[in-house]
Amino acid sequence: MAKRKTTSGSAPRARASARTRSAASRSRRPITPQDLLCLVGVGDTQMAPDGRSVLFTRKVVNAKNAYETSVWVADADGKRAPRALTTGPKDGLARWNPDASRVAFIRNDAKAAPRIMVVEAKGGKAHELLEMPHGTVRDFGWSPCGRRLAFSFRATAEEWTPEAKKHREDHGLSNPPRVIDDVWYRLDGDGYFGAERFELYVLDIERGALDCVFDRDTLGNFSWDWAPDGSALVIAANDHPRASWNPGETELFVVSLGDRGKHVLSKIPGLAKGPKSQPRWSPDGMRIAWAGRTGPDGMYGTGNVELFVHEFQAKRTHCLTAKTDLCLMAATLSDSGDPAFEPQLRWFPDGTALFFRAGWHGSGRIASIPSHGGEVAFHTEPGAEFNMGTFSADGWRLSCIRSSPLQPAEVHVLEVERSIFPMNRVTAFNDALVAELELVAPEERWLTAKDGHKVQCWTMRPHRAKGKLPAILEVHGGPHAQYGLTFFHEFQLLCAQGYEVWFSNPRGSKGYGMKHTAAIRGAWGTKDWVDVQAVLAAMRREKGIDAKRIGIMGGSYGGYMTNWAVAHDHGFRAAITDRCVSNLVSHAGNSDHPEVPNKYWKGSAFTDPRAMWKSSPIAHFGNVRTPMLIIHSEGDLRCNVEQSEQVHTALCTQGVPTRFVRYPKETSHGMSRAGPPDLRIHRLHEILGWWGRWMK
């Protein structure tokens, strides 16, 4: 990667004095649940090939309690205010054409089928290129030559299209049954898709011809990339007939595009077994990079997702990150944006390096490694969360999104150098709101568990707090993800209500190396609980905390740990379990991701459930005395609502105070960060009401 001689970072801001900051803090107000509706979301940044502008999506809540997304463009130097390029309300996946003169994007109207639209980069009316049948489009992009567009598309089954639903309503007919022939027929946040699968299509813009070029992936979970000359596509896909139980059977396919639909499909031979995702063709066309691992496990799990490069001529593959302990899927969780679960992988335009996002010790950082091997270099500072966009054609600029505990996500452009990259912040959508609010910065601590293991945690104490406060321990979901240094509305809200908030990354979390993550493989409620106990012990020793008013809460796996904690420790004043797991045996059979026997857990739910049952909180609920608020979505396909029903029944049977809040089937497992806006606010009021009842 060549070194740049000069940069054009944004002008430094004057640092306020302590007295000025204190006065500003006193003039600000506490954050409220309703402020969640005022946050502006940004995503999917795309650097213009000429490096002058950056595309992104902007997401807001409208007056009708719905999310609107539109495509915006900003100058890369941040000197002019960003401007809307499309009108929405459901526009996204915006992509520059190779000469940056036009932008293609996907328009998803509420009742219409998805359409491919094109608008001039300088603005104006968007024109339709193609209307697809009713369905879902993802992974959209121009060919490098600009003659074609490729995209993944999954059709909606005919009986579930808007037209079919309206016909039934008009004629008083019932909805049809769902007839299922495979275990893969639903996904949380995506809903029920039955036998329909994503397929890869290529649109020849000049001829107006549309071809399906790949339909071999058993689950439809493939990812792809263009060859640098636009003549072919590389696809990471699993065509094993039992792909759900064999994620390691992923292969790399190449589709060579011929004239008038004459395409040739081949497979790259000699690759090791293992999951593969986000294949990326090198700029010279001689190598393919991807994120994955070797072995039978899938992408999500206790092992590190690593970076591989395959050389076509030498017919050999290198794992570039083998000597590191980084994971390319260490997502940082938040309620104010989408976690970066998918690997983010980019070639530097001259082919000398590969860039990726690495989650480490609570930060999400942009890093790189030489493409022929070497040391990892970090290019963004710790203490924030970065999500990577794309490079300009010359490689001197890289788009990204940055958030921090005191700053919701905004679009930035990095000026590329070998060390820490200077940044231009090009959006300020949330600045006016932030200027009103009294926000709290987390303070880092490292604790030692009783077995000597080090645990990173953070504390947030309300401003001007005096005396002993009630405190809340938040436990993250996953479990193979991390809490960290990003904007978290819920944490700030609890602080504003007078609670000291603690959060940590116990064993099982990502961001601390594979040994830390794998410590609880098939053994939840063991070393993770040891680490949580270390945090609890520190809270109970803290001089500013009332040890008799400590609560615990968490969602998903965090709900699991909340359930486990109250079954093994009677020192909590109250608890909140959200979209929880309580019974691992039943969860193995009713989640959208069924458990593979004798993989993550020893045995299986239907042959030898002993390990799962031993680790199930519900097996220990005869000991629970702690008042609990239970929150769950009836449309949760990840952790079925029956998990919370079991908790509720157990508590009611024993006379333990409880309140069960069930959100309708239109909501999913991700309701706290992506659910209907009014229900997200309702959830926050329920949380505050429960803590106010038991902790004040």
Protein language model features and the residues they cover:
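Predominantly five- to eight-bladed beta-propeller fold
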Residues: 4-21, 68-69, 154-201, 246-253, ...
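Beta-strand-rich domains and repeat architectures in extracellular enzymes and scaffolds
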Residues: 34-69, 195
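Conserved beta-propeller blade repeats
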Residues: 39-54, 88-106, 126, 132-149, ...
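Non-catalytic accessory segments flanking enzyme active sites
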Residues: 44-46, 57, 150-152, 173, ...
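Short, solvent-exposed loop/turn segments at conserved positions within beta-propeller repeat blades
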Residues: 64-68, 109-114, 191-196, 243-250, ...
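Short loop/turn segments that connect beta-strands within beta-propeller blades
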Residues: 75-78, 120-124, 204-208, 256-260, ...
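Cap/lid segment of the alpha/beta-hydrolase catalytic domain
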Residues: 241, 326, 429-548, 555-556, ...
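Active-site-proximal cap/loop segments of hydrolase catalytic domains
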Residues: 503-696
